[in-house]
Regions:
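Aromatic-lined substrate-binding rim segments of carbohydrate-active enzymes
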Residues: 1-5
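Active-site acidic/histidine proton-transfer and metal-coordination neighborhood
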Residues: 6, 10, 15-107, 116
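Histidine-acidic metal/acid-base catalytic patches
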Residues: 32-33, 38-40, 57, 86-203
Length: 203
């Protein structure tokens, strides 16, 4: 795995599904794995911090200790939005801190998930991007038709990518992003190339 990542411009790791629960020991193991493959960022779902329902509460002290541990390993944590998760991201930033440079914990805006959300007005993707612009450290890019989390190639769904690129430019985002495309109808490389082409045409 480490050899496969050697020539990549950057490496990000998504927390593995079997660890999708709040367990600081397992989270540290994932941080160690990320560090071992040279990943600069570890993307975690809210459930990995114990946040599923509005009544759930962060173990603030332990989350901060985990984030500090990640910093010693050269890994930044990024909490990814799921559908309708403004309340979650706001809570994390309110209780842990809004500056990733200080907390070593930022936001990964998943554009596809934002497109499915109903908690952010008529243009949810742009709302998520603008709302978390100062805390964004990573992006997940994929498309869908606004109904299911399809992880389509860019341009195959209903996301307005021109508007996405314009919003990111206006926000001054200069961080990393990753294509999160499933399948590509049997031609995954073509799906990736087409998605890159969509972005290049809008740059």
């Amino acid at each position: 795995m480490q050899a496969a990542c050697t020539d990549a411009p950057f490496v990000s790791v998504h927390m593995r599904g079997r660890y999708w629960n709040w367990n600081p020991v397992n989270l540290r193991k994932e941080i160690d794995f990320a560090a071992a493959v040279g990943a600069q960022k570890l993307v975690i779902h809210p459930i990995c911090l114990g946040l599923v329902d509005p009544d759930d509460r962060l173990e603030v002290g332990e989350v901060r200790r985990v984030a500090d541990y990640a910093a010693t390993r050269g890994v930044r944590l990024a909490v990814e939005n799921v559908k309708d998760s403004i309340w979650i991201l706001d809570r994390v930033l309110d209780e842990i801190g809004v500056d990733p440079e200080e907390t070593n914990l930022g936001i990964c805006v998943d554009v596809g998930h934002a497109h499915l959300s109903r908690d952010a007005g008529r243009n949810p993707v742009c709302e998520y991007l603008e709302r978390y612009a100062n805390a964004m450290v990573h992006l997940h890019l994929h498309d869908n038709a606004g109904v299911r989390d399809e992880h389509l190639a860019l341009g195959e769904g209903t996301i307005d990518w021109r508007r996405v690129v314009g919003t990111l430019t206006a926000c001054g985002y200069a961080g990393t992003s990753a294509l999160e495309i499933h399948g590509g109808e049997g031609a995954p490389l073509a799906a990736i190339e087409n998605s890159v082409g969509v972005l290049q045409a809008l740059a």
